[in-house]
Each structure stands twice: as structure tokens, then as C-alpha cells.
């Protein structure tokens, strides 16, 4: 009897680790680079804060690169598994003729997320206020400056003719340059724009996203190697993003702000709530991570308008919606 009990106990001890491994799958670490740290990308911080990535067996480590080019470089070098960047970066890489070009696997935002900041408050802002003025627009060829040029042109403002747009300052240095005295206006993302206004360093006078209309603005890229070797990780990542996109649709501004607050230690809860409210009202976030071809064509039109388009890559060559569609249950 004792011998039988000992054998059963030994078998139980052998099987116990297997049972535990089924209940707790091995966590995979994903290195993901982003352009900047902004509430504009709220769904991904919510996915982190609410444990959506963890529930998919993912440990997502985020590095802030300071611009789309740097984020894309990290992906191309293998330093990043995924990167969040402007889709124009992928267009440029394809037009360089790179065979192993990165692929867009999901879309996060659907319009420009920046705000026009002036040095003094404007009770009734008019785009004519920019006549003869200088605007810090960001890096030439980047989405922030291209949508800015698009909007300004629609309002009769042409760089070099009746205004000046500075296109030589890196994205992550724009706020510092403006604070240091350069330019009459600058475009900034949240929460920097609101924090700037609270500190009296500048004043929000216009919402670029409302003026520009819908356009794919920030997307998730994966390398072809990642797609080939670890498709399940991409799908798991996008499932978490989709859950966050759906969650923020019905969450209160306060709940959304609290969920992402750990990733914005320098911003107050009130500021985060105000920013969430602003981006929600402007319909900035995608409701699912699937990019639409019509939106992609609009993107190419914006790039072409800015004189930065040397070729029009086919939608199916740059975008792979397979993972996003599975994540969203389509």
C-alpha cells in the first residue's frame, strides 16, 4: 500500500509542473520602439496599464526613439521587434528599393495629433495670424510637417511666400527650440501642449487634426522576418491593442487617464483627463487596428503634395491586414 502511494505521489509531482505550465504560458518579451511618448497613443499605454499584453503572454518593453526615422532604424537593425511610426517612413523605405522592407501590420491613430502653439493667447484665432510669421514644423518629410503644410496651404499660407516653416528641427527638439525663442508658432503633441500652456510657455490656438481630416498617422510596423517567424506574437500584440481600442470607447476620461498615468509621471491626472477628452472629441483613435486602402491613398496624396513622393507603393505591398483582422475578429 505504501509502495503504491509512493508511486502515485511521484507521478503527481512529475505532472504538476506540466499542469502549471499549461495554466501559465511562457511570457515572451517584445521590444517596441515609439516615435515619442504621447497620450495620442493612449490605447497602447492602456493595454500596458490594464494588463492586456500580459494576458496575451507578452512583456512589452517600450523605447522612445525621438522620431519616426529613429524608430524605423531600430526595426531595420533588429533592435526592435515592432515599431510605432508614421506610415510615410515605410513608403520612403519601399521607394528606396529595399526588398526586405518593413510592413505595416496595424494602425493606431487616424489623424494628426498635434496642436498649433502661439506665444500669446488668441481669443479668435485665424490662420491669417500666421501671415509673415515663422512656424516650427518638424523634420522635412515627416507626417507632422506634411499635414501642417497641407492645412496651411488650404488656408492660403505658402512657405517661402507669405510665411516661413522651419523644417530642420528634429521632432523631439521642437518644444525646446520654441521655448528657447525660435519661431512664432510651433506644433506640439499632448501632453506637452497642455503642460506648455499651463506653464505659460505657449498657448494652444488650433487643432491640426481637425483641420487636416482623416489620414493614417501612426502605425505598427514589423519586419518580414518577424512576420515569417513569429506571426502569433504580432497577432497577440494586436489583440491587446484592439481590446484597448474598444475599452477606451466607453471608458470615462478619468478611468482612461488613470490607466495610463504610470507612463506619464510628469503629467497631472487633470491634464491627462483633459487630453483624453480632447483626442476623443477629435476622433483621433482607430476603433480597430485595420488600415483602409482609401485612407492609405489619402496619405500618399499628402506626401505627394509635399513633394516627397518618388513612387506610389501598392497598398498590398506595404500593408498586411491579416493580423489586425484576426485580432478584431473579422
Where are the predicted features?
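Short, glycine-/small- and polar/acidic-enriched structural segments
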Residues: 26-170, 184-190, 201, 206-207, ...
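Conserved C-terminal helix/tail region of periplasmic/extracytoplasmic solute-binding proteins
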Residues: 300-330
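C-terminal motif of bacterial Sec signal peptides marking the signal peptidase cleavage site
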Residues: 16-19
Amino acid at each position: 500500500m505504501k509502495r503504491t502511494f509512493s508511486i502515485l505521489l511521484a507521478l503527481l509531482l512529475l505532472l504538476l509542473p506540466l499542469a502549471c505550465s499549461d495554466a501559465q504560458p511562457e511570457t515572451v518579451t517584445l521590444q517596441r520602439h515609439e516615435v515619442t511618448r504621447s497620450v495620442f497613443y493612449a490605447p497602447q499605454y492602456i493595454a500596458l496599464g490594464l494588463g492586456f499584453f500580459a494576458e496575451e503572454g507578452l512583456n512589452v518593453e517600450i523605447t522612445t526613439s525621438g522620431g519616426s526615422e529613429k524608430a524605423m532604424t531600430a526595426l531595420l537593425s533588429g533592435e526592435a521587434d515592432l515599431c510605432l511610426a508614421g506610415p510615410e517612413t515605410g513608403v520612403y523605405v519601399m521607394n528606396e528599393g529595399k526588398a526586405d522592407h518593413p510592413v505595416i501590420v496595424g494602425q493606431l491613430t487616424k489623424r494628426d495629433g498635434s496642436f498649433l502653439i502661439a506665444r500669446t493667447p488668441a481669443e479668435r484665432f485665424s490662420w491669417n495670424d500666421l501671415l509673415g510669421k515663422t512656424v516650427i514644423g518638424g523634420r522635412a518629410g515627416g507626417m507632422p510637417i506634411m499635414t501642417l503644410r497641407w492645412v496651411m496651404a488650404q488656408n492660403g499660407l505658402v512657405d517661402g511666400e507669405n510665411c516661413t516653416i522651419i523644417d530642420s528641427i528634429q521632432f523631439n527638439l521642437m518644444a525646446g527650440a520654441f521655448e528657447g525663442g525660435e519661431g512664432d508658432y510651433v506644433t506640439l503633441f499632448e501632453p506637452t501642449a497642455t503642460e506648455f500652456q499651463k506653464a505659460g510657455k505657449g498657448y494652444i490656438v488650433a487643432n491640426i487634426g481637425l483641420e487636416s481630416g482623416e489620414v493614417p498617422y501612426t502605425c505598427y510596423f514589423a519586419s518580414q522576418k518577424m512576420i515569417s517567424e513569429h506571426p502569433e506574437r504580432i497577432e497577440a500584440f494586436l489583440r491587446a491593442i484592439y481590446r484597448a481600442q474598444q475599452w477606451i470607447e466607453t471608458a470615462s476620461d478619468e478611468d482612461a487617464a488613470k490607466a495610463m498615468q504610470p507612463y506619464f509621471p510628469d503629467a497631472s491626472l487633470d491634464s491627462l483627463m483633459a487630453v483624453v477628452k480632447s483626442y476623443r472629441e477629435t476622433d483621433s483613435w482607430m476603433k480597430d487596428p485595420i488600415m483602409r486602402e482609401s485612407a492609405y491613398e489619402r496619405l500618399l496624396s499628402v506626401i505627394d503634395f509635399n513633394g516627397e513622393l518618388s513612387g506610389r507603393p501598392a497598398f498590398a505591398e506595404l500593408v498586411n491586414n491579416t493580423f489586425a483582422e484576426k485580432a478584431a475578429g473579422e
